[in-house]
Protein backbone atom coordinates (compact mmCIF):
# COMPACT_ATOMS: atom_id res chain seq x y z
CA UNK A 1 0.00 0.00 0.00
CA UNK A 2 2.74 2.48 0.92
CA UNK A 3 4.65 1.93 -2.29
CA UNK A 4 1.48 2.19 -4.37
CA UNK A 5 0.58 5.44 -2.57
CA UNK A 6 4.01 6.98 -3.20
CA UNK A 7 4.04 5.77 -6.80
CA UNK A 8 0.83 7.76 -7.26
CA UNK A 9 2.33 10.85 -5.63
CA UNK A 10 5.32 10.60 -7.97
CA UNK A 11 3.02 10.29 -10.99
CA UNK A 12 3.96 6.73 -11.87
CA UNK A 13 1.17 4.96 -13.72
CA UNK A 14 0.41 1.71 -15.48
CA UNK A 15 3.21 -0.67 -16.36
CA UNK A 16 5.95 1.69 -15.15
CA UNK A 17 4.28 1.88 -11.71
CA UNK A 18 3.98 -1.90 -11.38
CA UNK A 19 7.53 -2.53 -12.63
CA UNK A 20 9.01 0.01 -10.20
CA UNK A 21 7.14 -1.49 -7.25
CA UNK A 22 8.07 -5.08 -8.23
CA UNK A 23 11.73 -4.14 -8.73
CA UNK A 24 12.01 -2.43 -5.34
CA UNK A 25 10.06 -5.11 -3.47
CA UNK A 26 12.64 -7.58 -4.76
CA UNK A 27 15.65 -5.27 -4.24
CA UNK A 28 14.76 -4.55 -0.62
CA UNK A 29 13.59 -8.07 0.26
CA UNK A 30 10.04 -7.02 1.05
CA UNK A 31 8.38 -9.98 -0.72
CA UNK A 32 7.30 -11.78 2.45
CA UNK A 33 5.81 -8.59 3.93
CA UNK A 34 3.51 -7.54 1.08
CA UNK A 35 0.37 -8.22 3.13
CA UNK A 36 1.76 -6.74 6.36
CA UNK A 37 0.60 -3.33 7.56
CA UNK A 38 3.63 -1.00 7.65
CA UNK A 39 3.07 -0.23 11.35
CA UNK A 40 3.61 -3.94 12.10
CA UNK A 41 6.92 -4.27 10.24
CA UNK A 42 10.15 -4.79 12.19
CA UNK A 43 12.19 -1.55 12.33
CA UNK A 44 14.74 -2.68 9.74
CA UNK A 45 11.95 -3.45 7.29
CA UNK A 46 10.26 -0.14 8.01
CA UNK A 47 13.54 1.54 7.05
CA UNK A 48 13.78 -0.59 3.88
CA UNK A 49 10.21 0.31 2.96
CA UNK A 50 10.87 4.01 3.54
CA UNK A 51 13.94 3.92 1.29
CA UNK A 52 12.07 1.95 -1.38
CA UNK A 53 9.27 4.55 -1.33
CA UNK A 54 11.82 7.37 -1.58
CA UNK A 55 13.46 5.95 -4.70
CA UNK A 56 10.39 4.72 -6.60
CA UNK A 57 10.59 7.64 -9.02
CA UNK A 58 14.37 7.25 -9.53
CA UNK A 59 15.37 10.68 -8.21
CA UNK A 60 18.56 12.45 -9.26
CA UNK A 61 19.09 13.67 -5.68
CA UNK A 62 18.09 11.85 -2.50
CA UNK A 63 18.14 13.28 1.04
CA UNK A 64 18.34 10.70 3.84
CA UNK A 65 18.03 11.84 7.44
CA UNK A 66 19.60 9.30 9.82
CA UNK A 67 18.65 6.39 7.52
CA UNK A 68 20.23 3.71 9.72
CA UNK A 69 19.23 5.04 13.11
CA UNK A 70 17.98 2.26 15.35
CA UNK A 71 18.83 -0.66 13.07
CA UNK A 72 21.20 -3.52 13.75
CA UNK A 73 24.74 -3.57 12.25
CA UNK A 74 23.82 -6.08 9.53
CA UNK A 75 20.87 -3.97 8.36
CA UNK A 76 23.07 -0.86 8.54
CA UNK A 77 25.65 -2.48 6.25
CA UNK A 78 22.91 -3.62 3.86
CA UNK A 79 21.46 -0.10 3.78
CA UNK A 80 24.83 1.37 2.85
CA UNK A 81 25.13 -1.22 0.10
CA UNK A 82 21.86 0.11 -1.36
CA UNK A 83 23.01 3.71 -0.94
CA UNK A 84 26.35 2.99 -2.64
CA UNK A 85 24.55 1.25 -5.52
CA UNK A 86 22.44 4.37 -6.04
CA UNK A 87 25.55 6.55 -6.03
CA UNK A 88 27.19 4.20 -8.56
CA UNK A 89 24.12 4.74 -10.76
CA UNK A 90 24.56 8.51 -10.67
CA UNK A 91 22.23 9.49 -7.81
CA UNK A 92 23.51 12.25 -5.54
CA UNK A 93 22.81 11.16 -1.96
CA UNK A 94 22.95 13.58 0.97
CA UNK A 95 22.98 11.79 4.33
CA UNK A 96 22.83 13.05 7.89
CA UNK A 97 24.33 10.70 10.45
CA UNK A 98 25.72 10.66 13.96
CA UNK A 99 27.78 7.58 13.10
CA UNK A 100 31.22 8.77 12.06
CA UNK A 101 32.11 5.30 10.76
CA UNK A 102 29.22 5.71 8.30
CA UNK A 103 30.54 9.09 7.20
CA UNK A 104 33.65 7.24 5.99
CA UNK A 105 31.50 5.87 3.13
CA UNK A 106 30.86 9.39 1.83
CA UNK A 107 32.85 11.20 -0.85
CA UNK A 108 32.52 14.49 1.01
CA UNK A 109 31.25 15.42 4.42
CA UNK A 110 30.55 18.44 6.55
CA UNK A 111 30.92 18.52 10.32
CA UNK A 112 28.24 20.49 12.14
CA UNK A 113 28.83 21.68 15.69
CA UNK A 114 26.58 24.01 17.66
CA UNK A 115 24.57 24.71 14.53
CA UNK A 116 27.57 25.76 12.42
CA UNK A 117 29.59 23.95 9.81
CA UNK A 118 33.10 23.78 11.25
CA UNK A 119 34.75 21.75 8.48
CA UNK A 120 34.04 20.18 5.11
CA UNK A 121 35.96 17.89 2.81
CA UNK A 122 36.69 14.28 2.03
CA UNK A 123 36.96 12.05 5.11
CA UNK A 124 40.69 11.54 4.48
CA UNK A 125 41.23 15.31 4.25
CA UNK A 126 39.51 15.87 7.59
CA UNK A 127 41.52 13.09 9.22
CA UNK A 128 44.73 14.57 7.81
CA UNK A 129 43.86 17.91 9.41
CA UNK A 130 44.02 16.22 12.83
CA UNK A 131 47.35 14.49 12.24
CA UNK A 132 49.97 15.28 14.89
CA UNK A 133 52.93 13.75 16.67
CA UNK A 134 50.56 12.41 19.30
CA UNK A 135 48.10 11.06 16.70
CA UNK A 136 49.98 10.07 13.52
CA UNK A 137 47.00 8.13 12.07
CA UNK A 138 43.87 9.93 13.31
CA UNK A 139 40.41 8.45 12.98
CA UNK A 140 37.45 10.51 11.89
CA UNK A 141 36.47 10.69 15.55
CA UNK A 142 39.91 12.13 16.36
CA UNK A 143 39.43 14.71 13.60
CA UNK A 144 35.97 15.63 14.87
CA UNK A 145 37.26 16.13 18.42
CA UNK A 146 40.23 18.21 17.22
CA UNK A 147 37.99 20.38 15.04
CA UNK A 148 35.45 20.88 17.84
CA UNK A 149 38.22 21.87 20.26
CA UNK A 150 39.63 24.27 17.67
CA UNK A 151 36.18 25.81 17.16
CA UNK A 152 35.71 26.17 20.93
CA UNK A 153 39.06 27.96 21.22
CA UNK A 154 38.14 30.31 18.38
CA UNK A 155 34.78 31.11 19.99
CA UNK A 156 36.49 31.88 23.30
CA UNK A 157 38.78 34.37 21.56
CA UNK A 158 35.90 36.30 19.98
Pin down the residues of each PLM region.
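Conserved ABC ATPase "signature" region
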Residues: 4, 8-33
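ABC ATPase "signature
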Residues: 120-121
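Hydrophobic anchor residue at the start of the ABC signature
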Residues: 51, 79
Amino acid sequence: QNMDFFAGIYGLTGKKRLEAIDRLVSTFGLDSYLETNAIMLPLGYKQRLALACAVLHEPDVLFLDEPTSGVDPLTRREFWSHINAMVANGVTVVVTTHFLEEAEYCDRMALIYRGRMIAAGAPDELKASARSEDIPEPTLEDAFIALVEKDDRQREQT
